């Protein structure tokens, strides 16, 4: 494992963007969400650039970014999202994944977006090994690195390893 770092892609007001606009009219909510997305994209871009420079200083080059997508419905209207607490949570996650996608493209990186439910099959195909062996290796990657090393970090490592094989 070369670098493990969170991307700081929000300011305090926009940490949960759809929650922040939950009780606004659709027009005002749309405007605020656009602003929050611009902030998240700029912050993600700055973080990607900083991490890329850090790795460049160690003789490595960043070529791609992997994004694990949720299984949530993508084509839901804003009024429907704001009327459902579950959809608000899904939209919050999609908001930051979309910001990361745009930021990575702005940095001229290849972007691989894959639904979480297809990640293991994708990894098995890319790495040409039994998935049990792959998952065993991923589980060991975080040993001695300190917390967190939970399911999200393991999935991110699995996608990163898969991208290295391409």
Label each PLM-derived region with a short phrase.
Residues 1-166:
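Phosphate- and other anionic-substrate recognition elements at nucleic-acid/protein interfaces
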């Amino acid at each position: 494992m070369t670098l493990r770092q969170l991307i700081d892609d929000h300011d305090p007001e926009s940490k949960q963007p759809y929650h922040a606009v939950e009780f606004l009219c659709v027009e005002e909510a749309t405007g605020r969400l656009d602003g929050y997305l611009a902030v998240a994209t700029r912050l993600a871009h700055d973080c990607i650039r900083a991490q890329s420079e850090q790795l460049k200083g160690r003789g490595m080059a960043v070529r791609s970014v992997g994004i694990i997508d949720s299984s949530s419905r993508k084509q839901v209207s804003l009024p429907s999202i704001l009327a459902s607490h579950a959809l608000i949570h899904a939209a919050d996650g999609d908001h930051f994944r979309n910001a990361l996608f745009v930021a990575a493209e702005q940095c001229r990186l290849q972007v691989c977006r894959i639904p979480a439910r297809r990640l293991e099959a994708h990894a098995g195909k890319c790495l040409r090994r039994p998935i049990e062996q792959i998952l065993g290796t991923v589980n060991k990657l975080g040993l001695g690195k300190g917390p967190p090393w939970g399911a999200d970090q393991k999935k991110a490592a699995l996608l990163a390893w898969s991208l290295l094989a391409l």
